[in-house]
Amino acid sequence: MEELQGYLEIDGSRQQCFLYPLFFQEYIYALAHDHGLNGSILYKPMEIFGYDNKFSSLIGKRLITRMHQQNHLILSVKDSKQNLFVVPNKYFDSQMMSEVFAVIVEIPFSLRLVSSLEEKKIAKSHIRSIQSIHSIFLFFEDKFSHLNHVSDILIPHPIHLEILVQTLRCWIQDAPSLHLLRFFLYESRNSNSLIIPKKSISFFSKRNQRFFLFLYNSHIYGCESIFVFLRKQSSHLRSTSSRTLLERTHLYGKIEHFLVVLRNDFQRTLWLFKDPFMHYVRYQGKAIMASKGTHFLMKKWKYHLVNLWQCHFYLWSQPDSIHINQLYNHSFYFLGYLSRVQLNPSVVRSQMLENLFIIDTAINKFETIVPMIPLIRSLAKAKFCNVSGHPISKPARADSSDSDIIDRFGRICRNLFHYHSGSLKKQSLYRIKYILRLSCARTLARKHKSKVRAFLKRLGSGFFQEFLTEEEQVLSLIFPRTYSTSHRSHSERIWYLDIIRINDLANHE
């Protein structure tokens, strides 16, 4: 990593204009291999990326040798049968090159992230808590109880692969690297259709997920840049009227001149976005935008977003991609939770001398619950139960031991409880535990060709201990046996700051 940082610091312009020579450096392939095993450069676990263990430094050396032997490294994507390297295993070379390409283009952004964290004096140990999915719900609890309207947004996909290339041209001005990017995109298009997929997650190729995650995030960054632009313009205009920041006289003078020229068009449009209570949250291809403003303001946001996406970013937005609802009467689904703002009435008694006052108040409270029907559908899709929620047995491998099978089912149960620990009503989660526990018992009974009841009797209470959740284990140690720990675990809401990806079974998008 020190060699790479030294290379990038030779000249600031080289960080973006000369990425292609890095493909011929052996330490880049070693870096890609290490990140594949330990996590990406942005501190994310590699189970997200579906990493291939065959990707070794020895194979990287052989690939570099073959690249040096080639005379034509500029690709032609017109012929789908043409490949970069005339070798027997061309698919694996293409896969490895796309992984290396993703690592190379991540590096300048990662160095920028590290420098930004150092400027803001944020420790690297706090990165995981900042990236935690549960931290989003803490933000919801703090902000959404005071808002009025919420918009569910499905971010559109590019209508053509060349749009992704044009997006990266702002950062990568190296022509050979852009040709490589086109090659990888069109190769993936020939094997997997990436244009207007049915679901956002299907946008990523299962084979080169690191590469497509980077491209997708770059694409989303372009769509979200309009929020930053409008926020900055709105802030500048307010400062222009107040004349408080004298060191920006020239900047505000230009903006004032700009307003004189386009006062009738631009200023009339911009006032619609002067909403200090607008909040925006995104995960993958879905976003939530909430505001304290009126329904008319939210409709204006929808109108301008759709037009900007289609006219400026060339993104086709479906008519039903943005839904506007009143926050008090609507439950929105996000990150595996069903969230809503509930009015909780309360009675306050106050006595002054001989007079007794009773005041009825209503407090807005942000609530999160587990959607049972989508979760049971996910379990049915994974063959743990049928669509009605009745547990079924899964086919077990002959070489799998009983302890491995029990550990696998118990780990799935604990992970689900861990992810949904922020739910106010956990009673529904115990039905999920029942499904997984009985599915495990039926799987073991099927393996040993015996009845479920007899097999459970033989296993004893140790079998049920494997399905104890983390909260239940802690509460059982803190409180005595006579205390009802189940009541506490049902009512307590816990947010964990170590969860940086959505649970696979909870992702029903």
Swiss-Prot record:
Alphabetical GO biological process terms: mRNA processing; RNA splicing; tRNA processing
Domain of life: Eukaryota
One cellular-component annotation, GO: chloroplast
Alphabetical list of Pfam families matching this protein: Intron_maturas2, MatK_N
UniProt keyword terms in alphabetical order: Chloroplast, mRNA processing, Plastid, RNA-binding, tRNA processing
Compartments it resides in: Plastid, Chloroplast
Plastid among keywords: yes
InterPro entries cross-referenced by the UniProt entry: Domain_X, Maturase_MatK, Maturase_MatK_N
Gene Ontology MF terms in the entry: RNA binding
Family (UniProt): Belongs to the intron maturase 2 family. MatK subfamily.
Function: Usually encoded in the trnK tRNA gene intron. Probably assists in splicing its own and other chloroplast group II introns.
Name under which the protein is recorded: Maturase K
Species per Swiss-Prot/TrEMBL record: Drimys granadensis
